[in-house]
Amino acid sequence: MSNILIKNVDCLTLTEPVKIIKNTNVGISDNLISFVGKIPAGFKHDEIIDGKNKLLMPGLINAHTHLAMSLFRNYAEDVDFWTWLNDKILPAEEKLNRENVYWGSILSIAEMIKSGTTSFADMYFFTEETAKAVEETGIRAMISRSVVSGENSDKKLKESLDIFDKYNNTADERITVCSAPHAIYSCDEIFLKEVIAESKKRNMQIHIHLSETEEEVNNCKTKHLMYPAEYLQNLGMFDLKTMVAHGVYLTDKEMDILKKYDVSVIHNPGSNLKLGNGIAPVVKMLKKGLNVALGTDGAASNNNLNMFEEIYLATVLQKGIMKNSIAIKGIDAIKMATVNGARAMSLNNIGTVEKGNIADLILIDTDKPHFYPKFDLISDLVYSAQAGDTDTVIVNGKILMKHGNLLTIDIERVYFEIEKQAEKLLK
């Protein structure tokens, strides 16, 4: 790895108290941030990045997605959630193969890098191909083999555990692996207990969908005589570090349970809106002290992987439904997309720009019409910034994109392969 000097840059460190340091310098030695501020005497660099009209900040963290679902972007549109899932997506996923998932993963990683995401949490299939894509492209990821009960469930669970044994803390520790029972409606109680028991043997983190729809909640109440989070607590899932995606219909009691067990909630505002599933009570979650992170969900239900869009939605939606413009602040949403995501995914020393932390960083080009006048760059990031403003992306001290040019992905090859894969898959 090389030493990088970023000169004369405005820097949002996200350390407390949160502020922007104007016209500063940041050094990277190997994969770590070596200084913020004055350039130390004797610091030797292999590369200089001019930070003029740029804002340096921690890379964005997409804490819930389904990477290769980019293959189904714009495929199942304007239908209700259960039609979308049962009649369109699940039958299409039955046709997936390793090659499909590899190229779908590469496409999604390219989209994420281009829009400032440096880490993501994925649950999907053919996870070896996702791992291969992560290793090749240089991004950081928590991956998992999603499992459901039913036919071949034991085989799928074994695959999930094998993925952990083979890939956890690999690729210079950029890849971690968690356990991913899909949801309470797709995993019966016996299977969930088995997943939890096997995950405990390896101390695996859990990533699961929870309380995404009203129907899911009502069915759980009817079948188990309790709400979804109560049900999972009763099964012992929260004895393991857990993050739950969506949480749209969490009750006060459920939030208290999640807080007690330090369970993170991954808010997916764009996907929840598009599928008509509602708006999560994020303000209440934050007031109760829950760790709330952000995700895009898959590109089949969003239909992009743009975390700047999720930051914007996470802010304005809560202001709107609360009828209170100060119910949530822009900086809260930025933290959801950075430090809170790092906490949810157990990413230590990531999410802030400070000496000794891992260098997962992005540079935003603020020399754009929608950034002027520059009264408040934090507000600019929340309410004005676009995915295309991402100029440079660094993960683990390695530059993955410089001045908008992807350095680890042949994007024209990706476009060619994706059209070929989609045609074979959905013809």
Could you tell me what each predicted segment is?
Residues M1-T24, S29, I39, K335-K427:
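Active-site microenvironment of metallo-dependent hydrolases
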Residues V9, V26, N31, N53, ...:
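Divalent metal-coordination and catalytic microenvironments
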Residues E129-V248:
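Metal-coordinating catalytic core of metallo-dependent amide/deamination hydrolases
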